Amino acid sequence: MTSATQFDNVSVVKRANVYFDGKCVSHTVLFPDGTRKTLGVILPCALNFGTDAPELMEVQAGKCRVKLDGSDTWQTYGAGESISVPGKSRFDIEVIETLDYVCSYL
């Protein structure tokens, strides 16, 4: 079904998800089992996101710092690393190098 570099047998929603005046743009990928992911890019900036469901952000390229809701600690992430974000929470992200990511909704 999937490999390290691609997703097979999926549908893609054509309309982009554009947030923060175009600083974050993603596309929704729908899987046959009903799950969904977004594939996106965040340009260098500082943003605050809210979540409904728990999320797993897999960094494909770029570099960022993240501070989860309730924490005072910033954690740096780069290509090949994942960020786990609880549901019904917020997080701050500072994108240092344009971030290419895959977000799974758990």
Curated annotation (Swiss-Prot):
The keyword Hydrolase does not apply. Keywords: Glycosyltransferase, Transferase. It is an enzyme of class 2 (transferase). Its EC number is 2.4.2.1, 2.4.2.2. GO terms for molecular function: guanosine phosphorylase activity; purine-nucleoside phosphorylase activity; thymidine phosphorylase activity; uridine phosphorylase activity. GO terms for cellular component: cytosol. It comes from the Bacteria. Catalyzes the phosphorolysis of diverse nucleosides, yielding D-ribose 1-phosphate and the respective free bases. Can use uridine, adenosine, guanosine, cytidine, thymidine, inosine and xanthosine as substrates. Also catalyzes the reverse reactions. Belongs to the nucleoside phosphorylase PpnP family. This is Pyrimidine/purine nucleoside phosphorylase. The lineage of its organism: Bacteria, Pseudomonadati, Pseudomonadota, Betaproteobacteria, Burkholderiales. The gene is ppnP.
